[in-house]
Swiss-Prot record:
Amino acid composition bias (Gly residues), ranges on this chain: 270-284
Amino-acid positions noted as binding ATP in the UniProt annotation, renumbered to this chain: G97, Q98, T99, G100, T101, G102, K103, T104
Chain segments carrying region Disordered: 251-292, 397-421, 754-796
Family to which this protein belongs: Belongs to the TRAFAC class myosin-kinesin ATPase superfamily. Kinesin family. Kinesin II subfamily.
Listed name of the protein: Kinesin-like protein KIF3C
Region named Globular: 633-793
Coiled coil start-end: 378-632
CDD domains: KISc_KIF3 (cd01371)
Compositional bias (Basic residues): 401-416
Keyword terms of this UniProt record: ATP-binding, Coiled coil, Cytoplasm, Cytoskeleton, Microtubule, Motor protein, Nucleotide-binding
GO CC annotations on file: axon; cytoplasm; dendrite; growth cone; kinesin complex; microtubule; microtubule cytoskeleton; microtubule plus-end
Keyword Nucleotide-binding: yes
Protein location: Cytoplasm, Cytoskeleton
Length: 796
């Protein structure tokens, strides 16, 4: 990748203060912040300070008080950065501060009112206005929108916004997000629509400090690719990337305040309200502490990175401590131009948070970036589009559907043409209509046909010619009397088939032309929709505006330098007209030095207290992690077998890209195991698991204690029962004793089981016996039905 290296430049830091809210005024809070716009200084007064304690003063690149407008911040600070992005640099703008100090207002503002629009909508307008005024350049603008919620990266433009994305790193391109969606936009309306879709899926919630507070860090990424023909006749591509960051608000849980209802962060269309860094007593509860802990960790990691970069003594920069710092790696000390907007609250109850934000921003001033132009990268989408357009154009020229247009002087205007058949519904293709100018007189000739009109005309003419030719051939076949009817029919069918093939080819050509125009419409070409002299006037106005902003910046720097020079002059001046004058001058100097000494002592004391507070927070976090670790070890030692624990430990590996421990898959990635293996049986040959001791006991004997099945062994009687018939005469009366003897004899013969006995199904012994019949019917039943030995009843 070729690049134009530029000398290192410092990260630009500006401070902005909002006015007191009605709620703060009603509560009686006083204003403790003083902004000096000309000198770029912020003075913070401690409301709990002892008498005689001096306020703290911080100096920044620019300062905007409560009366400042959105346009002032954008024109003086952000506009030069957007111009650099259009030239091929990487740029980042992010707002940092306490929750409710106006970070989202600074970044987004109110979209419906032009005067209240923030950095993001003004950047949209700036980018596409610049493209429309450019000459002989092709642009491709892409947009992506993501958020970091509880250290998980989510794509806000995806159909599944809750899906977790992976963070990867390429040695050539740097850090990137795998499977992050990107949309090509052609105007301000489309890119605003993309952002509104993402805002609907962003996580926001309510806290004591802000009713609509951002619960995630949101990053809107705009990639601008520009192609321009150089002096060598080759097309050179520049790629600029703009990161617009809206940080979430961290929480200080130990600060008093009414609790708000808990619950998970909601999905709202507000796009975040509070957003931002610093510590905040927001009175959050429920799921908010969990969100706040993740936000605090990421912002603490951001502070550690800035401290390491500003100190110039650390060889290791902890970019990998959080997802936020890894994504902003180029923006902090890398290949980017970065602007940090520190938003402040003027109320007395926010003294600690404002002081923390000011110290954070003051450290960030010392960070040095090394921005360079990203020229001719390998993975540009614009180059792919140009190659695809050239291929489609060659196919159309081969089919004769695309003719060469003569070169002419033209004043161009833009026209919207509805999409042809085969193009997605509702799409609009931008066609450029050129009108020739007559050099002799100022009259315009009729407008020349557009590319789409020329294509449609060529297609219609070609189809009409082929149809006429086929009709003539069909008529000639009909008139030819030398042909047999079967041959005529066959030839006519061939002609009809040729006509159908012609129509299908025509449809394929139309689809190809539609694809060509769709690809070409995504490339924005400047200088075609506004008069050239108007473009020049607008460019002059922008240059004047930039000169005024640059003059203000130089004036501010000169005033700061004059103050330093005055102090040095007073120290160097050693001649006095009298002893009284010398005493007065040295007394004044002594008071000033004593005030500086007291300020340094107070700063040291504040730093010591902050160090103790940070150390206590770290100790508390360490103790909490130690308790969780002990609990997990206790569960593992008591509930997980050692062999299973060893299996789990053997599968663990460290993912260096994400800094996380992960499990190796059970089946290797290269093995194609289409059939799933069967689960191993616990006891082969048995229905239930049986111990080894029970198996040995079963082999030694048939003790039922060790058997899982077939506990009892019973011999099966397979001989069928014998059934015999008894016949009695109803009129003959017999002696009961004779009947009894006959029954006994028949019973003996039954026990002998003769082979001639009839086999019938009998009732089992376990069935309940039926009620015996009356005595008068016994003989009749015995005479009419066979008698079973078990059913013989003596009624004597």
């Amino acid at each position: 990748m070729a690049s134009k290296t530029k000398a290192s430049e410092a990260l630009k830091v500006v401070a902005r203060c909002r006015p007191l809210s009605r709620k703060e005024e009603a509560a009686g809070h006083e204003q403790i912040l003083t902004m000096d716009v000309k000198l770029g200084q912020v003075t913070l007064r401690n409301p709990r300070a002892a008498p005689g304690e001096l306020p703290k003063t911080f100096t920044f690149d620019a300062v905007y008080d409560a009366s400042s407008k959105q346009a002032d911040l954008y024109d003086e600070t952000v506009r030069p950065l957007i111009d650099s992005v259009l030239q091929g640099f990487n740029g980042t703008v992010f707002a940092y501060g306490q929750t409710g100090t106006g970070k989202t207002y600074t970044m987004q503002g109110t979209w419906v009112e032009p005067e209240l629009r923030g950095v993001i909508p003004n950047a949209f307008e700036h980018i596409f206005t610049h493209i429309s005024r450019s000459q002989n350049q092709q642009y491709l603008v892409r947009a992506s929108y993501l958020e970091i919620y509880q250290e998980e990266i989510r794509d806000l433009l995806s159909k599944e916004p809750g899906k977790r994305l992976e963070l990867k790193e390429n040695p050539e391109t740097g850090v990137y997000i795998k499977d992050l969606s990107s949309f090509v936009t052609k105007n301000v309306k489309e890119i605003e629509h993309v952002m509104n879709l993402g805002n609907q899926a962003r996580a926001v919630g309510s806290t004591h400090m802000n009713e609509v507070s951002s619960r995630s860090h949101a990053i809107f990424v705009i990639t601008v690719e520009c192609s321009e023909r150089g002096s060598d006749g080759q097309d050179h591509i520049r790629v600029g990337k703009l990161n617009l960051v809206d940080l979430a608000g961290s929480e200080r849980q130990n600060k008093a305040g009414p609790n708000t209802p808990g619950g998970p962060a909601t999905q709202s269309t507000a796009g975040g309200g509070g957003g931002g860094g610093g510590t905040s007593g927001s009175g959050s509860s429920g799921e908010r502490p969990k969100e706040a802990s993740k936000i605090n960790l990421s912002l603490s990691a951001l502070g550690n990175v800035i401290a390491a970069l500003a100190g110039n003594r650390s060889t290791h920069i902890p970019y990998r401590d959080s997802k936020l710092t890894r994504l902003l790696q180029d923006s902090l000390g890398g290949n980017a131009k970065t602007i940090m907007v520190a938003t402040l609250g003027p109320a007395s109850h926010s003294y600690d948070e404002s002081l923390s934000t000011l110290r954070f921003a003051n450290r960030a001033k010392n960070i040095k970036n090394k921005p360079r132009v990203n020229e001719d990268p390998k993975d540009t989408l614009l180059r792919e589009f140009q190659e695809e357009i050239a291929r489609l154009k060659a196919q159309l020229e081969k089919k004769g559907m695309l003719g060469k247009r003569p070169r002419r002087k033209s004043s161009r205007r833009k026209k919207a043409v509805s999409a042809p058949a085969g193009y997605p519904e509702g799409a609009v293709i931008e066609a450029w209509v050129a009108e020739e100018e007559d050099d002799n007189n100022n009259n315009h000739r009729p407008p020349q046909p557009t590319l789409e009109a020329a294509l449609e005309k060529n297609m219609e003419n070609y189809l009409q010619e082929q149809k006429e030719r086929l009709e003539e051939e069909k008529a000639a076949i009909q008139d030819d009397r030398s042909l047999v009817s079967e041959e005529k029919q066959k030839l006519l069918e061939e002609k009809e088939k040729m006509l159908e093939d012609l129509k299908r080819e025509q449809q394929a050509t139309e689809l190809l032309a539609a694809k060509y125009k769709a690809m070409e419409s995504k490339l924005l070409i400047g200088g075609r929709n506004i008069m050239d002299h108007t473009n020049e006037q607008q460019k002059m106005l922008e240059l004047k505006r930039q000169e005024i902003a640059e003059q203000k910046r130089r004036e501010r720097e000169m005033q700061q330098e004059m103050l330093l020079r005055d102090e040095e002059t007073m120290e160097l001046r050693g001649t006095y007209s009298s002893l009284q004058q010398e005493v007065e001058v040295k007394t004044k100097k002594l008071k000033k030095l004593y005030a500086k000494l007291q300020a340094v002592k107070a700063e040291i004391q504040d730093q010591h207290e902050e160090y103790i507070r940070v150390r206590q927070d770290l100790e508390e976090a360490q103790n909490e992690q130690t308790r969780e670790l002990k609990l997990k070890y206790l569960i593992i030692e008591n509930f997980i077998p050692p062999e299973e624990k060893n299996k789990i430990m053997n599968r663990l590996f460290l993912d260096c890209e994400e800094e996380q421990w992960k499990f190796q898959p059970l089946v290797p990635a290269g093995v194609n195991n289409s059939q799933m293996k069967k689960r191993p049986t616990s006891a082969v040959g048995y229905k239930r698991p049986i111990s080894q001791y029970a198996r040995v006991a079963m082999a030694m004997g048939s003790h039922p204690r060790y058997r899982a099945e077939n506990i009892m062994f019973l011999e099966l009687d397979v001989s069928p029962p014998a059934i015999f018939e008894m016949e009695f005469s109803h009129d003959q009366e017999q002696d009961p004793r004779v009947l009894h003897m006959e029954r006994l004899m028949r019973l003996d013969s039954f026990l002998e089981r003769p082979s001639t006995s009839k086999v019938r199904k009998s009732r089992s012994w376990c069935q309940s016996p039926q009620r015996p019949p009356p005595p008068s019917t016994v003989h009749a039943s015995m005479a009419s039905a066979p008698l079973h030995p078990a059913t013989v009843v003596d009624h004597d």
